[in-house]
Regions:
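C-terminal structural segment of proteins
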Residues: 1-138
């Protein structure tokens, strides 16, 4: 693995600023990124941790929908989404093993189009809107 700098912002604005740096890569669960780095297939100059950003964590309801932060682990999605979206909870509960479910995140799976997680298909099938710091993708 190559050397890298590490940033741990506490707000979305600070994360966006850190991610604007050349060679920066977002990190939350790291279930895809870290193995890729170990194989020397990726060499980001800066890892920007999203785990300390409260707005990117958890599952809540509001505005007629279910809101899931990108840094929310699969295990939390499996538990917290059950009452409102059982199919999504089942999907999240079937990803990997308990260790992967406790670290891997919904945002990482969607961003990497991870075929083992099936979240990209769930996003399309449910008509979900993905909200970033710059735009809404529906």
């Amino acid at each position: 693995m190559h050397n890298f700098d590490f940033a741990k912002p506490s707000t979305i604005a600070d994360a966006a600023k850190a991610l604007a740096a050349d060679g920066a890569q977002a990190l939350s669960g790291g279930q895809t990124l870290i193995p890729t780095m170990k194989q020397r297939l990726a060499a980001p100059g800066v890892l920007v941790s999203l785990t300390g950003i409260a707005e990117m964590q958890g599952v809540c309801t509001g505005d007629g929908g279910l809101h899931i932060g990108a840094a929310t682990p699969h295990a939390v999605v499996a538990k917290e989404a059950r009452a409102h979206y059982p199919a999504l909870a089942d999907l999240a509960g079937g990803i990997g093993d308990p260790a992967v479910r406790s670290r891997g995140t919904i945002g990482g799976s969607i961003a990497n189009n991870d075929p083992a997680a099936c979240y990209p298909s769930a996003v399309l099938a449910s008509g979900a809107t993905v909200v970033t710091n710059k735009r809404k993708i529906a």
